[in-house]
């Protein structure tokens, strides 16, 4: 138990908060359906181009940043985020780290939407 407490205390606050939100969202969605089912995930905030472009649901560009299609997707992303995010937050500070996290996520989702429209 002490190892877990020490590990959590050594984490950067903003990054740890992002990780906790990602895991919490995954656990909540897992209680209600299959996180590997595209229809279920689209109904719960995944980035889906027709919803964004035709229906104007631009908030999906943000909500989708916290969704993971299955446990392995969540696990791999969180392992990288825990270690790389801590380094980045300690180097840049909380505000700049969060700007990069959200800016990168939104930009990536916009690029994905653009590529779907273009093809």
Language-model segments: residues:
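N-terminal TM1-TM2 helical hairpin plus the immediately adjacent luminal interfacial "cap"
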Residues: 11-119
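Cytosolic juxtamembrane amphipathic/interface segments immediately preceding
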Residues: 1-10
């Amino acid at each position: 138990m002490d190892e877990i407490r020490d590990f959590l205390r050594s984490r950067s606050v903003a990054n740890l908060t992002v990780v906790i939100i990602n895991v919490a969202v995954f656990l909540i969605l897992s209680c209600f359906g299959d996180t590997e089912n595209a229809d279920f995930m689209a109904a719960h905030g995944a980035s889906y181009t027709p919803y964004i472009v035709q229906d104007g649901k631009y908030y999906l560009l943000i909500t989708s940043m916290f969704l993971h299609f299955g446990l392995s997707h969540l696990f791999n992303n969180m392992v990288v985020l825990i270690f790389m995010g801590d380094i980045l937050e300690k180097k840049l500070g909380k505000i700049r780290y969060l700007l990069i996290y959200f800016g990168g996520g939104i930009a990536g989702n916009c690029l994905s939407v653009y590529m779907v429209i273009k093809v």
